[in-house]
Swiss-Prot record:
GO terms for molecular function: DNA binding; DNA-binding transcription factor activity; protein dimerization activity. Homodimer. Interacts with FAMA. It comes from the Eukaryota. It is found in: Nucleus. The keyword Lipid biosynthesis does not apply. One of its GO terms (biological process) is regulation of gibberellin biosynthetic process. Broadly expressed. Keywords: Developmental protein, DNA-binding, Nucleus, Transcription, Transcription regulation. This is Transcription factor bHLH93. Its main location: nucleus. GO terms for cellular component: nucleus. Transcription factor. May be involved in the differentiation of stomatal guard cells. The lineage of its organism: Eukaryota, Viridiplantae, Streptophyta, Embryophyta, Tracheophyta.
Length: 351
């Protein structure tokens, strides 16, 4: 690397020295672009004010034919020396006899360059392997140091900044995981149920979860105790009611057993008038008694015109009938009475 940098400096300083512009370059070096004794600085010919401000035809041609050393450094990579460099030509160009006779010149700048080159030539040759010699012969395979430094800088900056930006953007733009969302939903349901339980339980000592659950358990125990007490009271009331109902049903049975004694005695009355006959019956109820009574009256020649019937406790019938004059002679009121008495299920004769 030291050898390549020294050769680059050497080429940059020696490019303007050509055969066609030898005299002009020497004059510019001694008077315009040489060593400044006042400021002790080197001003190369390419940075001269006259050279930059005033465009001469000869200088334009020279710049086109011989580009600057900085452009050469960027456009083409410097070749690496596999062996010792060849001996250098003398730096000072041959001067005419007239020029040397007229004045003497001192070149401390050129002497310093000669010392640098001599020190670089004394360095040992570079030892390479077989595969590396081919790569060294190809100048495009080894870019210049400036290009390498630029590429390394750009690569490192892009790598660090790009990856960090991507990671940050992924963290910012990414959605939460499914497990996190499920855990949030579970906690929300749990909090909602706790709030409902807190609203139901009348006595809450504290607002934390453990106290809410403890108070709810105590309240449930109190409710269960109340339910058990109410069930016991209901059983006691049921037993007392059953005894009371049994007493009532026993009294009703006794009443039903004594019912025939309480009923009135049967009554059958027949009242005849001019053309109408009135019939009044009161006896114990019997299935089909009404139908049999109506049929008996029709067989006796009595036609029912009006009738009032009651079956509330006893069977009672009050009817007004009409009969013909011929039947009055054949059937008496006593015959009608005895026929209705037998129809009611009584035996014997009605008094």
């Amino acid at each position: 690397m030291e050898l390549s940098t020294q050769m680059n400096v050497f080429e940059e300083l020696l490019v303007p020295t050509k055969q066609e512009t030898t005299d002009n370059n020497i004059n510019n070096l001694s008077f315009n672009g040489g060593f400044d004794h006042h400021h002790h600085q080197f001003f190369p010919n390419g940075y001269n004010i006259d050279y930059l401000c005033f465009n001469n035809e000869e200088e334009d041609e020279n710049t086109l034919l011989y580009p600057s050393s900085f452009m050469d450094l960027i456009s083409q990579p410097p070749p690496l020396l596999l062996h010792q460099p060849p001996p250098l030509q003398p730096l000072s160009p041959p001067l005419s006899s007239s020029a040397t006779a007229g004045a003497t010149f001192d070149y401390p700048f050129l002497e310093a360059l000669q010392e640098i080159i001599d020190s670089s030539s004394s360095s040992p040759p570079l030892i390479l392997q077989n595969g590396q010699e081919e790569n060294f012969n190809n100048p495009m395979s080894y870019p210049s140091p400036l290009m390498e430094s630029d590429q390394s800088k750009s690569f490192s900056v892009g790598y660090c900044g790009g990856e960090t930006n991507k990671k940050k953007s992924k963290k910012l733009e990414g959605q939460p995981s499914k497990n996190l969302m499920a855990e949030r939903r579970r906690r929300k349901r749990l909090n909602d149920r706790l709030s409902m339980l807190r609203s139901i339980v009348p006595k809450i000592s504290k607002m934390d979860r453990t106290s809410i659950l403890g108070d709810a358990i105590d309240y449930m125990k109190e409710l269960l105790d109340k339910i058990n007490k109410l069930q016991d009271e209901e059983q006691e009331l049921g037993n007392s009611n059953n005894s009371h109902h049994s007493k009532l049903f026993g009294d009703l049975k006794d009443l039903n057993a004594n019912e025939p004694l309480v009923r009135n005695s049967p009554k059958f009355e027949i009242d005849r008038r001019d053309e109408d006959t009135r019939v009044d019956i009161c006896c114990s109820p019997k299935p089909g008694l009404l139908l049999s009574t109506v049929n008996t009256l029709e067989t006796l020649g009595l036609e029912i015109e009006q009738c009032v019937i009651s079956c509330f406790s006893d069977f009672s019938l009050q009817a007004s009938c009409s009969e013909g004059a011929e039947q009055r002679d054949f059937i008496t009121s006593e015959d009608i009475k005895q026929a209705l008495f037998r129809n009611a299920g009584y035996g014997g004769s009605c008094l």
